[in-house]
Amino acid sequence: LKLRSRNFKQQLHSRRTHYSWLCDAAPMNPSFSSYLVNDVFGDPGLFVEVRWSKRALLFDLGHNDALGPTRLLRASDIFISHTHMDHFIGFDALLRVALGRGKTLRRHGPPGLIPNVQGKLHGYTWNLVDGYPLTITAHEFHPDGIQTATFLATDGFQRHDEPDAPLNGCTGQGPFTVFRDPMFTVQATALNHRIPSLAYALQEQFHVNFNKERLHEAGLPVGYWLKEVKQYFWEGQPDDFRFCATLYHEHHKETREFILGEIRERFVTITRGQKIAYVVDA
């Protein structure tokens, strides 16, 4: 099944929005597992699990009861297209399950996101949460730079503005980088919805494929240590990089030292990374 050369596009229509979910051709063992938060008549939203981790990304924050608390709490980074009600009403549900969890929730979105987050938080009384270690950051992306504000449960979610930062990858027009991780980047571009509405593209840097047959022939088990090896590749470690890994065999475990270049040569194939785009209301 040759998925690598194919694209598929699923266009979903509701009574209020034209919803486009584009998933680029992915490897047979994709790094991202994505699905819609609601059906075609519900609020727009896309939940993306980063496989083999406890991490997820959430695109838009509409009604999200279908996700449940466990999935919501995995989504430390949330990318908001705009703050119309059907894209932002789920803020309160996430806030409620995150209180007292010691988490940092990062929200990324268009101009106006910071005062809208502030307004949501000011809708409640916070005199009993001074011992709750919850931090919310909001990043607004403007043509001339990034504005950031932080809200802490320990002081009743007062607004703390941070210094502005330059926009990465853009001079005011076209795509710009919203979030960067060794494994992937999230880029955005502003569309016209009578307000700026951000469209997002999640791009894996590249995909690391392990040949399990060769690993087996070499007496090496699959397991968490391979995830660590992937991270070294995404971080750009050189071929002579040495590392130790704990290997779990059927009846024992051992710690061995490896050289990254030898792992690459014997067991690894690098292919194009997975890409997912999220576009609504334009």
Protein language model features and the residues they cover:
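Intrinsically disordered, low-complexity segments enriched in serine/proline and basic residues
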Residues: 1-10
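Metal-dependent phosphodiesterase/nuclease catalytic metal-binding core
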Residues: 11, 23, 161-282
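Conserved beta-strand hairpin/beta-sheet module of binuclear metal-dependent hydrolase folds
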Residues: 19-72, 77, 104, 200-202, ...
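Active-site metal-binding motif and surrounding structural segment of the metallo-beta-lactamase
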Residues: 63-110
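Active-site catalytic pocket residues across diverse enzymes, especially alpha/beta-hydrolases
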Residues: 95-98, 121-125
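Short, conserved secondary-structure transition motifs
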Residues: 113, 139-149
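A glycine-rich helix N-cap at a beta->alpha junction
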Residues: 126-141
